[in-house]
Regions:
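Bacterial N-terminal signal peptides
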Residues: 23-37
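Charged, well-structured binding/catalytic surfaces in domain cores that contact anionic ligands
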Residues: 218-219
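N-terminal secretory signal peptides that target proteins for export/translocation
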Residues: 1-21
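Bacterial Sec signal peptide processing site at the extreme N-terminus
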Residues: 34-61
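Short, positively charged
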Residues: 313
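Short coil/linker segments at helix-helix boundaries
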Residues: 52-83, 87-90, 101-213, 222-256, ...
């Protein structure tokens, strides 16, 4: 794993994909009042069906072109999911929706704001990071609950021998493995002074490795983009870390056909910064800014969020590089 200084600063270990919450939130909320007056068996059946609908809902948020609007709307959807989980705690689809939803919200709207606030108000930035950590922990908890339901004794076995425990995981578990590991590693990045959490890294690595083994193309480059940053500092792995990161970058770009900004941003803020290659850094981020957010509506929100990060990173060239080049930074 990379050193703790790098873990806590500019690089990111995963990117959001899907934003699969919210499309049914309002209509489901209206139905809940009716369910409350129904008989027990009817009520449980209806709640389970509502859970199915919410867990399988489409990508309304994903295609939105207004990140600030989504930022305000997502908490309502997340609390609705939690309300349904209180009634149907064994609904693995809802647990996955909660795990992915809280991780995405923490990443795209809380931790991102913390990074941007750090130079202006450190106290506010630290408060935001503390909040992001709590949200990531909630995401991780929901993911582990779902995996426990699918594989009895999973968490205990994971802590005893991660690789052995994960042999029981199958392709249907990949989304849970991804989101649980993503939230977990993000918690660790925000807890560099907590040795107990840092000691969890072997479990995170085992989960990501198993997910990659089962479905390397999951999320249309989600795992590859995660591994761009992660491989750069993985401890004990064979081969050149940079070569591994660049291989995942190429795979992510191929799978997304160049329509995702996240791989470009990830390589720039990990490998380019590490190598102090400001020319490559600017080139990658300007390519990220050039991604047409309307070409793939399902990735519109994610691309807008990553393009905002690209602009912020370009504004920090003088902080990130000892000898920046003389070209003009593109912050359009």
């Amino acid at each position: 794993m990379r050193n703790l200084r790098n873990l806590s600063d500019s690089d990111r270990d995963f990117h959001p994909y899907g934003w699969r919450i919210g499309s049914l939130a309002l209509s489901l909320a209206c139905v809940i009042a009716f369910i409350g007056s129904s008989g027990c068996s009817v009520r449980q059946y209806a709640l389970h069906k509502l859970g199915d609908a919410l867990a399988q809902s489409g990508t309304t948020f994903a295609s939105d072109d207004d990140p600030d609007l989504v930022k305000d709307a997502v908490p309502f959807s997340l609390k609705l999911i939690e309300s349904l989980l209180a009634e149907t705690p064994r609904h693995t689809g809802l647990l996955l929706a909660a795990s992915s939803g809280f991780a995405q919200y923490a990443y795209g709207f809380v931790q991102e704001e913390a990074d941007e606030m750090e130079q202006r108000d450190l106290a506010v930035a630290n408060a935001l990071r503390s909040r992001a950590k709590r949200l990531y922990l909630r995401s991780k908890s929901y993911g582990l609950q779902a995996l426990e339901l699918k594989h009895r004794g999973f968490e205990k076995a994971l802590r005893e021998n991660p690789k052995t425990a994960l042999r029981t995981a199958n392709a249907s578990d990949v989304p849970l493995l991804y989101w649980t590991a993503a939230a977990w590693v993000s918690t660790i990045r925000l807890s560099k002074d907590n040795p107990e959490l840092i000691a969890d890294l072997p479990m995170v690595e085992a989960m990501i490795d198993r997910a990659f083994e089962l479905n390397p193309d999951f999320g249309e480059s989600a795992l590859h983009t995660f591994l761009i940053a992660y491989e750069a500092a993985r401890q004990g792995a064979k081969g050149d870390p940079e070569a591994r990161s660049r291989k995942h970058f190429e795979e992510a770009m191929a799978l997304s056909k160049g329509f995702q900004a996240a791989p470009l941003v990830s390589l720039a803020e990990t490998i380019s910064v590490k190598n102090q290659n400001v020319v490559e850094f600017k080139s990658l981020l300007n390519r990220a800014l050039a991604v047409d957010v309307n070409a793939k509506p399902a990735w519109r929100l994610e691309n807008l969020i990553m393009q905002r990060r690209a602009r912020w990173l370009l504004s920090r060239v003088e902080e990130l590089f000892l000898v920046p080049d003389e070209t003009t930074t593109n912050t359009k």
